Amino acid sequence: MTNTLQMTRRTMLTGAAVAGALTPILTSGGGNASPTPVRKLSATEIAALPRRKLDLVKPPFVHVHTQKAEGGPKVVEVTLTIEEKKLVIDGKGTEVNAMTFDGSVPGPLIVVHQDDYVEVTLVNPETNTLQHNIDFHSATGALGGGALTVVNPGESAVLRFKATKAGVFVYHCAPPGMVPWHVTSGMNGAIMVLPREGLTDGHGKELVYDKVYYLGEQDFYIPRDEKGEFKKYDSPGEAYEDTVAVMRTLTPTHIVFNGAVGALTGENALTAAVGERVLIVHSQANRDTRPHLIGGHGEYVWRTGKFVNVPDRDQETWFIPGPTRGAAYYTFEQPGIYAYVNHNLIEAFELGAAAHFKVTGDWNDDLMTTVRSPSGS
């Protein structure tokens, strides 16, 4: 196993060097291809912009932010610390040697506004064992920043990119030769780039949300022993070969929301009140998904998460292709428990892709009422 891990690291380093060599090609070709020219600020102008530091929070919650931009573009400072850690992902004690941004699966949701400059400090503590980087699907050039942020244990890097596109986007680790292993070990998150004037229905109506929740759907691939029991390992490197063998079957053993079966159900349910307008950001970095709110609807849905597009209306289920982030807006109208699921019901009920909303308020008989209670014939 040690030799395999060493070979893997050499492959990663070689790949990183190749990616670095490609960087001038990628960046030099990007400007002319841009369909929407954006004024280029000089280094001096960027240095003079106001700066704002984000205090990120763990999902399903989202840091404090304004829905409309205040003033002009800013430099938004973000720090993401990589943490390799064991996570228990179900009630049976099944473990995964997770790779995470800031210790959670998914990594924190970052919220900025279009045309802000996002300055990310990526920290790989010396307590980790592997090389990592970060690829922002919202960024332009250098493999989403992946070619510029390769950090070994004990290193850090600082990347700045301009958030030119409005929408919800994936970010994930993408070390050369090992991308799927890192992503399916939990190393992904999302960034939401809001339009500077806030969300609309595409026809001029403002869409203001009272709450925003961030759900990360994660597929895990846990090896089994000869008795069919899930195996446990001391480190990610020790688990590597067995995990990749399961990954190649394209058959997850677990598909969960926010890192574990039941992480967002029961006592951990998301909360809302009748009349509250809730934005649900749905994150899946690897597979297609089909969110459905049982008892409710997608009042406005950006299926691929891009706010320049007119949202779909009154959806029962919406399709989010992987790897894409989607967003849905809903005003809760009845109290009770709502199940939010991947409506591939096998994945929801058998593998774990389910969450609950617990909604308080007064019941509306006009929307639903019992005409006759269940009784014998």
Curated annotation (Swiss-Prot):
Predicted to be exported by the Tat system. The position of the signal peptide cleavage has not been experimentally proven. Homotrimer. One of its GO terms (molecular function) is copper ion binding. Its EC number is 1.7.2.1. It comes from Rhizobium sullae. Binds 1 Cu(2+) ion. The Cu(2+) ion is held by residues from each of 2 monomers of the trimer. Nitrite is bound to the Cu(2+) ion site. Pseudoazurin is the physiological electron donor for the Cu-NIR in vitro. Cu cation 2 binds at H137, H172, H343. The type I copper site in NIR plays a crucial role for electron transfer from pseudoazurin to the type II copper site of NIR, which comprises the catalytic center of NIR for the reduction of nitrite. GO terms for biological process: denitrification pathway; nitrate assimilation. Its cofactor is Cu(2+); Cu(+); FAD. This is Copper-containing nitrite reductase. Gene3D superfamilies: Cupredoxins - blue copper proteins. Cu cation 1 binds at H132, C173, H182, M187. Residues 99-194, 259-360 form the Plastocyanin-like domain. The keyword tRNA-binding does not apply. One of its GO terms (cellular component) is periplasmic space. It is an enzyme of class 1 (oxidoreductase). It is found in: Periplasm. Residues 1-35 form the signal peptide. Belongs to the multicopper oxidase family. Pathway: Nitrogen metabolism; nitrate reduction (denitrification); dinitrogen from nitrate: step 2/4. Keywords: Copper, FAD, Flavoprotein, Metal-binding, Nitrate assimilation, Oxidoreductase, Periplasm, Repeat, Signal.
